[in-house]
Amino acid sequence: MSLKVLIVDDDKMIKLVHKMMVVKSGLSTEPLVFDEGKSAYDFLEAQHTDFDNYLILLDINMPIMNGWDFLDAIQGKEFVNKLQVVMVTSSVDAGDRNKANEYPQILDFLEKPLKVDACNYIKSLPTVASLL
C-alpha cells in the first residue's frame, strides 16, 4: 500500500518547515503542499478515479476554506475512507480540540511547527503505519 502526504497550511514558512520535517523523518519523500483547504479539496476531488491513501496534515485557520470547512466538505464523499487527518495548528482553544473528536478521520491534534519526533510519532500511529 502507499500513503501520500498532503500539507495544508497558509503560512509559507510553516509549509517549508513541515515539508522538510516530513521528508527528513521518512514519512514521505514528496509531500504535496496546499495553501488552503479548497485547493486540497479540489485536488482530492480530481483524484476520485485513481485514489490512493492520503495523510493530511491540516491547519485550522486558513483563508477561503479553513480546516473545519474542509473536514465538513469531505464527509460523505466516496474517498473519505482513504483519508487520515492530523490537525497541525497553533490553536490552543480547547473547543478546537473537542471539535476534532467529531471527525472520525482525525487521528490526532498536534501543535505546530512539526518536528521530526512528531513526524515519527505520526508514522507510529497504527492507521498510518499500516499504510507505509
Describe the residue ranges of each PLM region.
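Conserved acidic segment of CheY-like receiver
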Residues: L3-I14, H18-V22
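Conserved sequence signature across two-component system core domains
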Residues: V8-D10, F34, I56-D59
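Helix N-cap/capping motif at the beta->alpha junctions
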Residues: V33-D42, G67
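Short amphipathic alpha-helix used as the core "switch/output" element in two-component signaling
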Residues: D42, W68-N81
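Active-site beta3 strand of CheY-like receiver
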Residues: H48-L57
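Receiver (REC) domain active-site loop signature in two-component systems and cognate sites
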Residues: M62
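Alpha4 helix (beta4-alpha4-beta5 surface) of REC/receiver domains from two-component response regulators
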Residues: D69, K82, V92-D108, V116, ...
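Hydrophobic/aromatic residues positioned on beta-strands within the core alpha/beta folds
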Residues: V86-T89
